[in-house]
Amino acid sequence: MAAKIRREDEVIVLTGKDKGKRGKVTRVLVTGKVVVEGINLVKKHTKPNPQLGITGGIVEKEAAIQVSNVAIFNPATGKADRVGFRFEDGKKVRFFKSNGELVK
């Protein structure tokens, strides 16, 4: 089945501590999660490793978020939207359900 949310899509968070925030999808995981730029930041404590050149400390990075908790952002309407699929010229394309425009 084709993915409704893909890498480089702009999404909006629907639930959780970052509700209402927007960001670009950097990774889509096979477990049904996505990593969004600047969303769901967690602090990770790392040990120094001189062999790898890693300095120790507290690093802030993005954690994965469930794909059901984000929706694709429609720039035409300025709101979250749903995605559908249809065939155009023999190719499967994604479109916004609210206005029928193609995604990207």
Swiss-Prot record:
Gene Ontology BP, a term: translation
InterPro entries, per database record: Rib_uL2_dom2 (IPR014722), Ribosomal_uL24 (IPR003256), Ribosomal_uL24_CS (IPR005825), Ribosomal_uL24_KOW (IPR041988), Translation_prot_SH3-like_sf (IPR008991)
Short name of one Pfam family: ribosomal_L24
One cellular component (GO) term of this entry: ribonucleoprotein complex
Keyword Glycoprotein belongs to the record: no
Keywords: Ribonucleoprotein, Ribosomal protein, RNA-binding, rRNA-binding
Top-level taxon in the UniProt lineage: Bacteria
Signal peptide: none
UniProt keyword Mitochondrion, yes or no: no
PROSITE patterns listed in its UniProt record: RIBOSOMAL_L24
A molecular-function term among this protein's GO annotations: structural constituent of ribosome
Family: Belongs to the universal ribosomal protein uL24 family.
UniProt cross-references to HAMAP family, sorted A to Z: Ribosomal_uL24_B
Subunit structure: Part of the 50S ribosomal subunit.
Its job: One of two assembly initiator proteins, it binds directly to the 5'-end of the 23S rRNA, where it nucleates assembly of the 50S subunit. One of the proteins that surrounds the polypeptide exit tunnel on the outside of the subunit.
Annotated NCBIfam families: rplX_bact
Protein name per UniProt: Large ribosomal subunit protein uL24
Gene of this entry: rplX
